[in-house]
Amino acid sequence: MPLPLVAIVGRPNVGKSTLVNRMAGVRSAIVHDEPGVTRDRLYQEVEWNGRRLRVVDTGGLVFGDDSEFLPHIRQQAMAAMAEAQAVIFVVDGREGLTPADVEVADWLRKQPLPVVVAVNKCESGQMGLAQAAAFWELGLGDPIPCSGIHGNGVAELLEAVLAHLPEVTAEAAGEPDPIAVSIVGRPNVGKSSLLNRLVGSERAIVSPISGTTRDAIDTVVTWEGQPYRLIDTAGIRKKNRVQYGIEFFSINRAFKAIQRSDAVLLVIDALEGVTEQDQRLAGRIEEEGRACVVVVNKWDAVENKDTHTINEFTREIRDRLYFIEWAPLLFVSALTGQRTHKIFEQVNTVVAAHRKRVPTAVVNEVLQDALAWQSPPTNRQGKQGRIYYGTQVADRPPTFVLFVNDPDLFKDNYRRFLEKHFRQNLDFTGTPIRFLWRGKSERLVGRAVRKLERSLTSR
């Protein structure tokens, strides 16, 4: 059963995102003392007293002004209302009732949804009651004083809104766990357009202005029965071009989005090719051990393509992103939809590899085959490397322990050969793999292996 949805609306800078973060118990939406910080619809799950719901945070509503992003923000708020079963109307208790609040209230009265008025920034209990009383004249029911910063009144607010929603417990909401997929890249490479193409609706504001998306935005979409949590992030810039403030928080949020992803779509601009920032971002994905698909966007805009063009682009990308050469490439157009239908297929492939577990017997068969192809190196003193045994100790990413006589005997070129051999024989497309080299004498290997296997079976 899908979770009921509550839309959070109000004029700019009344603390909607702070209140949403308090309800959800996380700091997801960017919170900053600047009007218009939240531009898109941001979804989060909330659990309260065994009940579950989703809330959608929207940008600040301003009527009668069509400058900058304001029409887009109104469009996003209306889309949120179309999905929702109830509304929390957030106002500022410190400022009191304003004409802008009255405009929003007039608009809400025309909507066929129950409305709960949350009077935010009421840090004092007794004073909060007096502050909330000023909003009775809106005619939208009992205003509830609360504080997104301190948390007081939030329980009462949740109880009030849950009274308007169908009861869905944590158990009743059971469904396959969504695969978390972050969409990252430099500004203006088409991340939000790609998200909208995958979702099939204008979920995030799409604009040619660099830096339109400020938050990491989560959208859940289901494809062939599998839910995916798509995370659209602010474009990554060089540090010396980032001013401290909103964009600083957005870039930090984008890196954190990579951390909480199962797979990452690294979006490259086909017209600009791989840049230094793309390389740094790819390095971050590898460091975090995340599965990855490299999505080359704007392929429709590449002129004079022939049968060799895609191979030439592939060679250039592989040369510049050599440290994630294991990541599959997709040449797509978010604008026309060209090949975007293959993205979910590729995500499934790389996530399966990222989560793969290989039996110990198979690991050692592959090791013996590798040794038959290329013997371990010998140092200048005539001492040759020996690999006694290997076993997988973790997934996400797949991680193997190799017991050897001396790890220093195995230089980078042999380690790369071994990784390539594992990839060819065990199909680790789209995921980094790790090797932990443990020096042991042959006499002690059996004891170490038994100890390791006992620790794995006790987990």
UniProtKB/Swiss-Prot annotation:
Residues reported to bind GTP 2: 185-192, 232-236, 297-300
**Which residues are listed for GTP 1 binding in this entry?**
10-17, 57-61, 120-123
Can you name one GO molecular function term for this protein? Answer: ribosome binding
Report the residue ranges that make up the KH-like domain in this protein: 356-441
InterPro entries in the record, alphabetically? AAA+_ATPase (IPR003593), G_ENGA (IPR031166), GTP-bd (IPR006073), GTPase_Der (IPR016484), KH_dom-like (IPR032859), KH_dom-like_a/b (IPR015946), P-loop_NTPase (IPR027417), Small_GTP-bd (IPR005225)
* Record-linked PROSITE patterns: G_ENGA
GO biological process terms held by the UniProt record: ribosome biogenesis
Q: Where is the EngA-type G domain?
A: 4-169, 179-355
| Presence of keyword Repeat | yes
UniProt cross-references to SUPFAM superfamilies, sorted A to Z: P-loop containing nucleoside triphosphate hydrolases (SSF52540)
Give the matching Pfam families. Answer: KH_dom-like (PF14714), MMR_HSR1 (PF01926)
Instruction: Report the domain of life of the source organism.
Output: Bacteria
Q: Which UniProt keywords apply?
A: GTP-binding, Nucleotide-binding, Repeat, Ribosome biogenesis
Checking PANTHER family in the record gives: GTPASE DER
Subunit structure as annotated in this protein's UniProt entry: Associates with the 50S ribosomal subunit.
Protein's job = GTPase that plays an essential role in the late steps of ribosome biogenesis.
Q: Which family does it belong to?
A: Belongs to the TRAFAC class TrmE-Era-EngA-EngB-Septin-like GTPase superfamily. EngA (Der) GTPase family.
What's the protein called, per UniProt?
GTPase Der
Natural source organism: Synechococcus sp. (strain JA-2-3B'a(2-13))
